[in-house]
Regions:
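Short acidic/glycine-enriched loop/turn segments that link adjacent beta-strands
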Residues: 18, 60, 105-109
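Conserved Nudix-box catalytic region and its N-terminal flanking loop in Nudix hydrolases
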Residues: 46-87
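A short coil-to-beta-strand element that immediately follows conserved catalytic motifs
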Residues: 14-15, 92-100
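Active-site-adjacent beta-strand/loop module that shapes the phosphate/pyrophosphate-binding cleft
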Residues: 100-123, 136, 153-154
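Acidic, metal-coordinating catalytic segment for phosphate/diphosphate chemistry
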Residues: 1-42
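NUDIX/MutT-family hydrolases
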Residues: 124-155
């Protein structure tokens, strides 16, 4: 972002408290760009005796992660995670528990992760390039993003394996 969305003046960095924030260069405007993280929901999705991992279109061939997506306006995190499960893999979801909230600074997101049980037959959605069904004892957390939720879910089950680098 280079220009103020209110008056089109250039944005400049200014010290505000303990942070540098982009602010409007026009003294009469006062616009401040806070760059708040976007809320993302993620489902550690159990289907039968497996955990479902998905590969989004545009991801490298070997990358798989949890079903996840951005919240829609007016949607609760619980509604959002169930919608994402339906959109991405066609399953009716049932929330088992909240796993946790995780900062994902690299993408300027905060991830709200849920343990969800899926019912029905998997139907791959438009955004998904592939699906893997992984037995929980073979599931390994990855270091970024939703991998932290996998780590905590496995630890709560007493089955934490080594993190995949």
């Amino acid at each position: 972002m280079k220009f103020c969305p209110s008056c089109a003046s250039p944005l400049v960095g200014r010290e505000m408290g303990d942070r540098t924030r982009l602010t409007c260069s026009s003294e009469s405007c006062g616009y401040v760009f806070y760059d708040n993280p976007a809320p993302v929901v993620a489902a550690l999705l159990e289907h039968g005796d497996t955990v479902i991992l998905v590969r989004n279109k545009g991801w490298p061939e070997k990358w798989y992660g949890l079903v996840s997506g951005f919240l829609e306006k007016g949607e609760s995190p619980e509604e959002g995670v169930l919608r994402e499960v339906k959109e991405e893999v066609g399953l009716k979801g049932e929330i088992v528990s909240f796993i946790g909230a995780y900062p994902f600074s690299e993408m300027n997101q905060v991830i709200l992760a849920y343990h969800v049980r899926g019912h029905g037959e998997i139907e791959i959605g438009d955004e998904i390039a592939g699906v893997k069904a992984v037995p929980p004892d073979k599931l390994r957390p990855w270091p970024l993003g939703t991998g932290q939720a996998v780590r905590d879910w496995l630890a709560a089950r007493g089955g934490l394996g080594p993190t995949v680098a």
